[in-house]
Regions:
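Short alpha-helical transmembrane segments in multi-pass integral membrane proteins
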Residues: 1-33, 93-160, 202-257, 315-380, ...
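N-terminal transmembrane alpha-helices
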Residues: 20-52, 56-60, 73-88, 92, ...
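Transmembrane helical elements of multi-pass membrane transporters/channels
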Residues: 31-50, 154, 165, 188, ...
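Transmembrane alpha-helix boundary and packing residues in multipass membrane permease domains
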Residues: 36, 40, 52, 91, ...
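Helix-terminus/linker motif at the lipid-water interface of multi-pass membrane proteins
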Residues: 41, 45-66, 135-142, 198-205, ...
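Small-residue hotspots at the loop-to-helix junctions and early N-terminal turns
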Residues: 62-73, 152, 211, 284-299, ...
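Small-residue-rich hydrophobic transmembrane alpha-helices
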Residues: 65-125, 162-181, 275, 289-353, ...
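Short runs within selected transmembrane alpha-helices of multi-pass transporters and secretion channels
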Residues: 86, 155-173, 181-189, 210-223, ...
Length: 460
């Protein structure tokens, strides 16, 4: 057999292996979702470990933790642009692969890379220009601004690498190479876990060391992603000819990615308004408590996010292939797993909040405030499952308008106004700020889910 024939046979066997119209839907989803969950959990955990180390720094640990917590909404907004390209382009690739148009799928991937490069350079420059006033606006005090600025100075220097790794990894996962996608994150995470204590404590770099460890780790992850997508093992490959922006593709990528982008940005906006309100009503102590709570939230939400994102290539591929019955089977499976998980997490956080808080900081005053705040914040957490289910279906099937609307509805339309209004009702004060989250979980989650059932489910 000739080399060309051998290559074609190998390519066909790889493609057949990743044909999601065959086999069990639940098996296909789990096969993709588990590595993605592990990868994203590791990714979140190594960011959380940064905060754990900083929270236990001798002397100024609480202030360092709070300062970095104030900076994280900015980082989340920057990373949302990576998601805009990755979460917008990768599902489109799955749909086009399902239709058999791999050429268009590769053009989508190439255009997504170009968009990432443009956004990365622009946001780095803008970040250096506006970071100090923005950090004050986001809840920094004169005591914590030093730590927030120090972290951002280093982080922005390597921001482009972070965006490339985060934005292009979904294109590995969307082709069915879930383990390779997981390795992207694991490589960076392990390196970060090694460098964190060395830079923070060994070299005595403090918050700058935490940022440097993150940037170096993400650089290695970005190189790994780009090498794989340019190599022979990938089904869809990066090609220089596909980097030229095409207006129609850019429009499709941004339209579909706008849902995840909006969700990330509005999450950050809620955190920003929450931090600013907590600073007003309670000071640095409450902002520090919320830094811990948002860190915990990142960890416990990630399995839901990873699982639903892992289902997207499978649902999108089958939808593109016209297999609507299999799509409904997949949605049922996602619903069952996601709701069960959310209820379990809620029970643990309600019963053992103190043990969780001590992982970050054991200071008595902070512990007391954080335990009460955590119970308020997660009081109705399990309703978040309905938001993830509905949002996942909208994105998987290319329903960009609905996906964007419900991202905005839960946080921008409900969350931010409630944070501003509830503290003034019945003199709730600080508890009004904390109570906004459970209210938005119920209303936003149920509205998204039942709209999906009416507009999408009935038509499948």
């Amino acid at each position: 057999m000739s080399e060309k024939a051998t290559a074609e046979t190998v390519s066909k066997s790889i493609a057949d292996k990743h044909d999601f119209t065959k086999g069990s839907m639940s098996d296909s989803i789990v096969r993709l979702a588990l590595p993605m969950i592990l990868a994203q959990l590791v990714n979140v955990l190594y960011n959380i470990v940064d905060r754990m180390y900083l929270g236990h720094m001798p002397g100024d640990g609480r202030l360092a933790l709070t300062g970095v917590g104030v900076a994280f909404p900015i980082i989340t907004i920057i990373n949302a642009f990576a998601g805009l390209c990755g979460s917008g382009g990768a599902p489109l690739c799955s749909i086009e692969r399902g239709r058999g148009d791999e050429g268009k799928a590769e053009r989508i991937m190439g255009n997504s890379l170009t968009l990432l490069l443009i956004f990365g350079v622009f946001l780095t420059g803008l970040g250096y220009l506006v970071k100090t006033p923005v950090l004050y606006l986001f809840g920094a005090s004169d005591e914590t601004i030093v730590y927030a600025n120090a972290y951002m100075d280093v982080y922005l220097a390597g921001n482009l690498f972070v965006m490339l790794g985060l934005g292009m990894n979904p294109f590995i996962e969307s082709q069915g190479f879930a383990k390779t996608g997981m390795l992207t994150v694991v490589i960076g995470a392990v390196l970060n876990l090694v460098l964190d204590p060395l830079f923070i404590f060994g070299l005595k770099l403090g918050v700058r060391g935490a940022a440097a460890a993150t940037i170096l780790s993400q650089f290695v992850s970005a190189v790994w992603v780009l090498r794989f997508l340019s190599g022979k093992k990938a089904i869809l490959r990066l090609r220089i000819s596909d980097l030229r922006l095409r207006g129609e593709l850019v429009k499709q990528i941004l339209a579909l990615g706008l849902s995840g982008f909006t969700m990330s940005v509005t999450n950050s906006l809620v955190q920003i308004f929450c931090n600013a309100s907590l600073q007003f009503y309670g000071g640095d102590l409450y902002v520090g408590a919320m830094t811990i709570i948002y860190s915990v939230r990142e960890v416990v939400q990630m399995p839901m996010q990873g699982f639903t994102q892992g289902a997207q290539p499978v649902l999108g591929y089958n939808y593109g292939a016209g297999q609507n019955g299999r799509v409904k089977t997949g949605i049922r499976f996602v619903r069952r797993v996601t709701i069960s998980y959310a209820v379990g997490v809620w029970a643990v956080l309600m019963l053992f909040p103190g043990a969780v808080v001590r992982l970050f900081n054991g200071e008595a005053a902070l512990l007391e405030v954080a335990v009460v705040s955590m119970r308020w914040h997660f009081a109705l957490f399990f309703f978040m499952a309905f938001q993830y289910i509905g949002q996942n279906v909208f994105v998987s099937l290319g329903k960009a308008k609905q996906a964007v609307f419900f991202s905005l509805f839960r946080k921008a339309i409900l969350g931010v106004p409630l944070i501003l209004i509830l503290p003034h009702l019945w003199d709730l004060g600080i508890y009004g700020v904390l109570g906004a989250e459970p209210v938005t979980n119920v209303i936003g989650g149920l509205a998204c889910y039942f709209t999906m059932m009416r507009l999408v489910w009935k038509k499948l």
